Amino acid sequence: ADTIVAVELDTYPNTDIGDPSYPHIGIDIKSVRSKKTAKWNMQNGKVGTAHIIYNSVGKRLSAVVSYPNGDSATVSYDVDLDNVLPEWVRVGLSASTGLYKETNTILSWSFTSKLKSNSTHETNALHFMFNQFSKDQKDLILQGDATTGTDGNLELTRVSSNGSPQGNSVGRALFYAPVHIWESSAVVASFDATFTFLIKSPDSHPADGIAFFISNIDSSIPSGSTGRLLGLFPDAN
């Protein structure tokens, strides 16, 4: 199975797999059962921003999800990613719908990682920024139902021609270049990621959510991972 570390924006409470009974943000280490969660007032039809940071000195992965009205949720978890992830990874965004549905629209996405080496005193950095997504976005690997170009956005899950979200859909977008996320001789390894999103649903219960994830470089969508598995995990263990 793939090795996945993710920050989930989970719109639907699947209490049978340990979710709290409300929409939440969570940190997932190799399992959809979050290590840590925080209550999130998801605003249907409003653009929100997610900001994720990590550095190897504090060994803490943190995320803040906020809306223009100042409403925000924060979650953090202490983890040494050297012990969890391979040295080279890919970063991506994933989303799913199930019985209930929502649009999982990404309007922008940026990422920066830095690796400061002891031996050479050099800093290796990787940076990308998408302020919009074109039809033929060559530097993204699209998986499942993900498409780009509609209004300059990235649609992670299926949307009908009139803009209505579809159920039982899963899609992911990964940056094409592998990221050197850690190195044994590095003094500091750090990264931060930001994306803006729009979740819109005609249902009283939108589902299922969006995640920023880091994985082994050959990661693909596990079969049967629509709905509560967010396109990331093969099962709910």
Curated annotation (Swiss-Prot):
Name the protein family: Belongs to the leguminous lectin family.
For this protein, the record's Pfam families field holds: Lectin_legB
Q: Where does a carbohydrate bind?
A: N14, G98, L99, Y100, D208, R228
- Per UniProt, which keywords does this protein have? Calcium, Lectin, Manganese, Mannose-binding, Metal-binding
A single GO molecular-function term is:
metal ion binding
* Quaternary assembly: Homotetramer.
* Species lineage: Eukaryota, Viridiplantae, Streptophyta, Embryophyta, Tracheophyta
Q: Where does Mn(2+) bind?
A: E8, D10, D19, H24
Its recorded name reads Concanavalin-A
InterPro entries tied to this protein: ConA-like_dom_sf (IPR013320), Lectin_LegA_CS (IPR000985), Lectin_legB_Mn/Ca_BS (IPR019825), Legume_lectin_dom (IPR001220), Leguminous_Lectin (IPR050258)
Q: Which CDD domains match?
A: lectin_legume_LecRK_Arcelin_ConA (cd06899)
Q: State where Ca(2+) binds.
A: D10, Y12, N14, D19
